[in-house]
Amino acid sequence: MSLVCSVIFIHHAFNANILYKDYAFSDGEILMVDNAVRTHFEPYERHFKEIGFNENTIKKYLQCTNIQTVTVPVPAKFLRASNVPTGLLNEMIAYLNSEERNHHNFSELLLFSCLSIFAACKGFITLLTNGVLSVSGKVRNIVNMKLAHPWKLKDICDCLYISESLLKKKLKQEQTTFSQILLDARMQHAKNLIRVEGSVNKIAEQCGYASTSYFIYAFRKHFGNSPKRVSKEYRCQRRTGMNTDNTMNALAI
């Protein structure tokens, strides 16, 4: 089972260049590191202890905690935390890495506790879910963050630290494309906006379309009806629902 991330406990301060940026890491600091950049920390392994988390553990943690997924524009590749009881954490990591780790439920609770240290950090859930989502799911998460943005394939590659050719290949393996994911996300957002927004021009803009006429064309092709037609159907449904409620109230009286 592949690792998703690691929790690193620093016991000796060190300076490092991670993803072309210089960082100073302090004694007693705790990091959560995406496995995609874990290799950048390898030269400094003598300065820290760590525990790795596989997909099964992350999935179970997300299910048990029931935390809502909140995405960030560019997913963080590592998170930092401080003011943690270092003595206790040191013992936890030592136990989890030892051969004495024979109580599964207890070990699992300790693993969950290590993850929860970062629960208040911005990008926490995104880092975890990016490790267990499909590639298409990761792309969808990114574009959904800001659908009004004129997304290009290169933008997504920069967020995922992956080449354009490799991203295309991985999406092809999942039987989809970047264009299809972007279109589906925008159309679903447009359909939701139509329920509350009357202006087609505004909806087109909020969904990332510079041309309203092209948005109408894309919407009709996707759903089989124009935005105005769908909006009218929603209004009729609401009126029908209100009339039904009024009738029921009258009968009750």
Curated annotation (Swiss-Prot):
The record's function comment reads: Induces the expression of gadE and mdtEF. Could also regulate the expression of other genes involved in acid resistance.
Q: Which Pfam families match?
A: HTH_18
Give the induction note: Induced by EvgA.
Keyword field contains Transcription: yes
The record lists the lineage as:
Bacteria, Pseudomonadati, Pseudomonadota, Gammaproteobacteria, Enterobacterales
Please name the PANTHER family in this protein's record.
Answer: ARAC-FAMILY TRANSCRIPTIONAL REGULATOR, HTH-TYPE TRANSCRIPTIONAL REGULATOR APPY-RELATED
Which residue spans does the record list as DNA-binding?
154-175, 200-223
Q: Which GO terms describe its molecular function?
A: DNA-binding transcription factor activity; sequence-specific DNA binding
Native organism is Escherichia coli O6:H1 (strain CFT073 / ATCC 700928 / UPEC)
Entries under SMART domains matching the protein: HTH_ARAC
The HTH araC/xylS-type domain is annotated at: 137-233
What are the protein's UniProt keywords? Activator, DNA-binding, Transcription, Transcription regulation
Q: What is this protein called?
A: HTH-type transcriptional regulator YdeO
Q: Which InterPro entries match?
A: Homeodomain-like_sf, HTH_AraC, HTH_AraC-typ_CS, Tscrpt_reg_AraC-type_HTH
